[in-house]
Amino acid sequence: QWLTRNSEMSKFEGVVWNNVLVGCGSNVKGVEKGWPYAANTVVEKTPEEVEKPFLTVNDGKYSVFVPKVKNNTVGVSWSGDKVDGEFIDLDKFYVAKPGDSVAKINSQLNAGKNLILTPGIYSLDAPIEIKNEDTIVLGLGYATLKPTNGNECMKVADVGGVSIAGVLFDAGQVNSSTLLTVGTAGNKTSHKDNPITLCDTFYRVGGADETPGKATTCVIINSSDVIGDNFWVWRADHGKGVAWTKNTADHGVIINGDNVTTYGLMVEHFQKYQTMWNGNGGKCYMYQSELPYDIPNQSSWNASGSYGYTDYKVAGNVTSHE
C-alpha cells in the first residue's frame, strides 16, 4: 500500500502489499516483476505531474511558489537550475488565523486574494467559498476546517487553476452533506489547460474528540480535469466518539467530473460505497481502502439488490476508466 511518485532511485525492495511507482522511470531494480508475480506496478511516466505550492523566502522576502503542472514526467521536478512555476508575493495572500470569521475570509477571497491558513482549528458556520480562477489555498501545519452548523467546509466554483493544498477537513457534530465540493453538478466545462489541483488534502469523520463527527460524503468532485495528489479520507475506526451510529458517513469520495486523475487515493471505513466514480476518463494511480469493521449486522449494510457494498464503484454508464 505504497505510492512512490517522481522519485529517482536505483533499487526498491521489501515489498509486501501493493507497491506502485509512477514517474520513476523503468530501470529501478527490485520491481522488475509485476502483478500477478509480485505486488509491483510500474508506470514509467507521470501523465500529469502536480506538486503542491510552498512557502519560501528569498533575500528576506516571503512568497509562495506555485509549481507548473507538467505532462509525461520522469524523476524529480527540481533537479535543474530552473524550476517551472510562479512566485507569488505574500501581499497577494490573506494570512488567516483560527478565530477569523468566514465572512472576513470570504471577503478577502472575493477581493482577489489567495489564502494561507496558519496552523490551528477553524470553526466555520458557513463554507469558505473559492470563486476566482487561479486562487491558491495553502494550509500550514495541518490547518483544520471544522463546520459548526452542518455546513460545508469549503466550496470551489467551476473555475480553472484553483489549488487547494495542505488542508484537513474535519466533520462537525451536526451532519454535513459534504465537507468539500469542487465545481457544480452537471457542469462539463473542460479545464484541461488549467486544471484544479488538490494536493495533500485530508478528510476525517470522528476519532479526534468525544463529540462524534458526521458527514454524508467527505468530498464531491464535479469539475472535470481535476488532479488529486495524496488523498486520505477516513471515517474513524478508532479513537474518540467512534461507533456505527455515532460518527456516521455514507461515502468517502464521489467523482462526477470527467478526466479526473488521482495519485494516492486512500479511503477507509465508510458505511456505504467508499469511492463512487461516475465520470468518464478517470484515472487512479494507487488506491488503498478498508471496509468498515463495525457493521452490526447484515441488514445494516446492504446495497440495493445485493449484500454489502462494493468498495470502489465505477458507474455503469462509464465507458473509460483506468
List each language-model region with its residue ranges.
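Extracellular/periplasmic carbohydrate-active domains that bind, remodel
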Residues: 1-322
